[in-house]
Amino acid sequence: MSWQDFLARHQVGDVIEGVVTDQVPFGSFVEAEGFTGLAPGQSWPAGTRVSVRILAMDPDRQRFSLAPA
């Protein structure tokens, strides 16, 4: 899936499923549909499957922010 496809399929507020790829001091990175977003303040261990809500999308930088669903 391309980034443009991701943007066409999803909008802020959508709930998606993903897998935590990394935990850092400021949050957890979650891969969903081939793209990685940041869940600030979350401390999920790598490999955990999570349901997350899209909080914000940055089309130019191909980034998105997430929160627990």
Q: Could you say what each language-model-derived stretch is?
A:
Residues 1-69:
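Single-stranded RNA-binding regions, centering on S1/OB-family and related RNA-binding modules
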